[in-house]
């Protein structure tokens, strides 16, 4: 018999110490990685339930195992809330990750060797949008588009030219490091011109889309995917959506997830997704997302005022790229210097980056996590000044120590879990 008072601390102190250290790090460090966020205690509670014990291969009402009557309710709640949140007529909540959701779309709509047109990783796309190191570039004929190097915006003329030239079966819109507003309608216009599917990966902006402050791709795309963390602030996982009312495609998508790419769904994670979708339907979520954008804009503006280059000259969403080429600082060194002061970012390539992806010449900076813990525009601006103080001379250890003390004080004022 399993006793309810069994715990990690007593049984595995080494593991427990690592967990406690990570908890402390999250509280005492300022998180600026654009793809990270903090889930609510309700999401954590759902993810820690006995639902993790239940195998449920298949879909609600069509399971391969018995005893699924209760987890069917859980999954149906997640599906209905996802549809309501994004205005979809189809939702699959089973993908374990955004990349697995994307892989399912490829499997459902394409044959091996088909041509796809996606955003270059070097210009802000994602590995699964056709990178040569990903399944999307290895199993398919991937053609890549980029941004206008002058404006930092998507070059729609190039997208159309490449589409007409290569006749892709699927065009991928979406990004992992792009600070502008994407014209989903323009992408659909190009896709229709060449008879291609339009697949949108909105993983980074799903929360903004749900709140109605970033254009929704749902009226334009054949299929949409997203992660359920990032701006959506739910558990780590994936989601597939559509609003085209095409049952044939819906069946293909379901089959591509199970049995095509996965076995049993993670029912405890699906429960956590259901909680997160309900939270995203609350009015407070819209207020949060509005502040996310305000904070990101304030940070980008402050960097520019301090003499730093921001790709595209600012941001219209939750993230931006800091170009350090003119400062002769590598992204790797900048990442480390800020990390020493308890400010967590990630090094990132910038357009025309002369350095390798392991070194880079830029930083990707995002505001979802700091906003989640309560930072407003004032705190965001102050934080940016501290970051500039460090980047002005990354060898100045006195500045680093001073900023670290200020960061710790600010984190104490705005705990993640108060």
From Swiss-Prot:
Sites bearing N6-(pyridoxal phosphate)lysine, chain numbering: 230
Principal location: cytoplasm
GO molecular function annotation: glycine hydroxymethyltransferase activity; pyridoxal phosphate binding
Record note on quaternary structure: Homodimer.
Catalysis: reaction(s): (6R)-5,10-methylene-5,6,7,8-tetrahydrofolate + glycine + H2O = (6S)-5,6,7,8-tetrahydrofolate + L-serine
Location of the protein in the cell: Cytoplasm
Domain of life: Bacteria
Family: Belongs to the SHMT family.
UniProt-listed Enzyme Commission number(s): 2.1.2.1
Site (Plays an important role in substrate specificity): 229
UniProt pathway: One-carbon metabolism; tetrahydrofolate interconversion; Amino-acid biosynthesis; glycine biosynthesis; glycine from L-serine: step 1/1
GO terms for cellular component: cytosol
One matching Pfam family: SHMT
Gene Ontology BP term (one): glycine biosynthetic process from serine
Keyword list, A-Z: Amino-acid biosynthesis, Cytoplasm, One-carbon metabolism, Pyridoxal phosphate, Transferase
Keyword field contains Cytoplasm: yes
Name of the protein: Serine hydroxymethyltransferase
Cofactor: pyridoxal 5'-phosphate
Gene: glyA
Residues that coordinate or bind (6S)-5,6,7,8-tetrahydrofolate: 121, 125-127, 356-358
Function: Catalyzes the reversible interconversion of serine and glycine with tetrahydrofolate (THF) serving as the one-carbon carrier. This reaction serves as the major source of one-carbon groups required for the biosynthesis of purines, thymidylate, methionine, and other important biomolecules. Also exhibits THF-independent aldolase activity toward beta-hydroxyamino acids, producing glycine and aldehydes, via a retro-aldol mechanism.
